Regions:
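Residues that recognize and position ribonucleotide moieties
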Residues: 41, 98, 147
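Conserved core segment of the aminotransferase class I/II
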Residues: 121-159
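Glycine-centered flexible beta-alpha turn that most often forms the glycine-rich phosphate-binding loop
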Residues: 102
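Conserved core of the PLP fold type I
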Residues: 1-95, 106-125
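Short, Asp-centered acidic motifs that coordinate Mg2+ and/or phosphate
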Residues: 64-65, 97-98, 129, 144
Length: 159
């Protein structure tokens, strides 16, 4: 995703703390990040909204995409609440942004509840590119993952 979308000078909005592996991948292409704090309900989307509005009002470029691990955020361990999932999608629509949903823990539910819906399943505008993995439930050593999303984006993932 970083290779496909990031050019020098581009920025990425992401929850902080962020998964170190993702940060390493992004840093190969940019050093500009818009950190968004999180709490027990995940990324604080009202803070993201404030940061995006501030950048837009100042004439600054918006991030190329929003990156989040919505279930079992690594390293924080929190999940994005249903309300914030909806708000995040509203912000992506309002500011014409993509969301990179890195969700290797969707199938690993440690709580006694139904899994939360994926951002992609809630997205009527095809703004979400979803990264999934079998590594957490099947074979951790294989590092087996896949991406799904809008066809016009996923076609660039083909080998």
């Amino acid at each position: 995703m970083a290779y496909l979308f990031l050019d020098a000078g581009d920025s990425v909005a992401l929850s902080e703390p962020v998964y170190p592996g993702a940060m390493a991948a992004f840093r190969a292409f940019t050093e500009r990040f818009i950190p968004v704090p999180l709490d027990a309900q995940g990324m604080i989307t009202t803070e993201l909204e404030r940061l995006l509005a501030k950048r837009k009002a100042a004439g600054e470029s918006l991030p190329k995409f929003i990156y989040d691990v919505p279930n079992g955020n690594n390293p924080a361990g929190v999940s994005l609440s249903p309300e914030r999932r909806g708000h995040l999608l509203q912000l992506a629509s309002k500011y014409d942004l993509l969301i990179l949903e890195d969700d290797p823990y969707q199938l690993v539910q440690l709580e006694d509840r139904d899994p939360l819906p994926t951002l992609q399943s809630l997205d009527p505008e095809e703004r979400v590119v979803r990264l999934d993995s079998f590594s957490k439930i099947f074979a951790p050593g294989l590092r087996l993952g896949y991406a799904s999303g809008p066809a016009e984006i996923i076609r660039y993932f083909q080998l």
